[in-house]
């Protein structure tokens, strides 16, 4: 049996992405067959395609997030039945119409959760969750600085931090994105194309600084963040959209008793009980509209190159999804 897949034979520009028919693997006893309805595009897909993140074995199917319906289950599968709604992330090769996966690498959705919203929020929502609860536990009255605040993770990070009671400062690259970030809940918004974000953070916090800086930009912002970090604060790096971070002198942190942390969502999906609970908590907030998910645009399967270009050129505000229905 065949399925359409997004595939690369080498890492490089958007034109390395190919739409091809590939074989569906034979189902093992602990695996399920999923019919995907929606795919979620994330910046990790850009990094894996362009070589910023190395892929050990090529050629390979790509993609890291999708939602759909269970079509078939292996004889030893306990958690799912045919017809269940599911979502999953951090499984390389997810950009296929049909996908075979171990039952412990996906989570069940409640019936009140829309599959489109699930594909638009699983990876980014769970990322925002571990960032605000594990990498740094955001507290009431914290000053939180979020780079790329109008992007998918940035929007959810803002809303989650506001639910907790933090003051949120967001950075963006243009005035349109500034309006998006402001409408999404940022207390202050900085356009870093014409303002120095470090000095503006000091101004907005009465020279206190940010308790935590969430940085998915990397090279262009990371070291400058040290200038506006509060005492005992933390910079959390979880992406490198502008390039790899230059080496820094860790002694610069010592006068502030500050710290640096990194984060990766994969670690928080390895224990299925934790993975399922975290997803349930996220989607409860989404269902209750306490966290609102903005979908920027839908593409069809054959438009994957266009979707990559739009995300890589930072033209998107919110989530780009691929519609397979």
Question: Which ranges hold each PLM region?
Answer:
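Glycine-rich phosphate-binding loop and adjacent beta-alpha segment
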Residues: 172, 220-291, 323-325
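C-terminal capping/lid region of NAD(P)-dependent oxidoreductase domains
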Residues: 288-294, 305-325
């Amino acid at each position: 049996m065949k399925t359409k897949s997004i595939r690369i034979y080498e890492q490089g520009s958007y034109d390395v992405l190919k739409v091809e028919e590939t074989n569906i693997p034979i189902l093992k006893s602990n695996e399920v067959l999923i019919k995907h309805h929606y795919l979620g595009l994330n910046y990790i897909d850009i990094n894996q395609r362009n070589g910023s993140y190395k892929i050990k074995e090529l050629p390979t199917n790509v993609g890291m997030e999708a939602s759909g319906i269970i079509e078939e289950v292996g004889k030893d599968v306990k958690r799912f039945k045919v017809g269940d709604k599911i979502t999953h992330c951090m499984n390389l090769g997810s950009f296929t119409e049909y996908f075979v996966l171990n039952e412990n690498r996906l989570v069940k959705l409640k019936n009140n959760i829309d599959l489109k919203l699930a594909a638009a929020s699983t990876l980014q929502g769970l990322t925002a969750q571990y960032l605000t609860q594990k990498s740094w536990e955001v507290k009431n009255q914290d000053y939180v600085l979020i780079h790329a605040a109008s992007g998918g993770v940035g929007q959810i990070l803002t809303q989650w931090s506001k639910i907790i009671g933090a003051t949120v400062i967001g950075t963006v690259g243009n005035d349109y994105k500034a309006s998006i970030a402001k409408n999404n809940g940022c207390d202050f918004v900085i356009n870093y194309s014409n303002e120095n974000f470090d000095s503006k953070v000091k101004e907005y916090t009465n020279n206190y600084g940010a308790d935590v800086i969430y940085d998915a930009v990397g090279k262009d912002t990371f070291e400058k963040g040290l200038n506006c970090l509060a005492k005992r604060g933390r910079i959390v790096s979880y992406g490198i959209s502008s390039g790899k971070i230059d080496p820094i002198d860790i002694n610069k942190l010592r006068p502030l008793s500050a710290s640096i942390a990194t984060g990766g969502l994969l670690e928080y999906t390895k224990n299925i009980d934790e993975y399922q609970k975290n997803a349930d908590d996220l989607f409860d907030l989404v269902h209750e509209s306490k966290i609102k998910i903005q979908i920027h645009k839908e593409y069809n399967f054959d438009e994957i190159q266009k979707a990559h270009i739009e995300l890589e050129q930072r033209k998107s505000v919110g989530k780009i999804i691929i519609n397979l229905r």
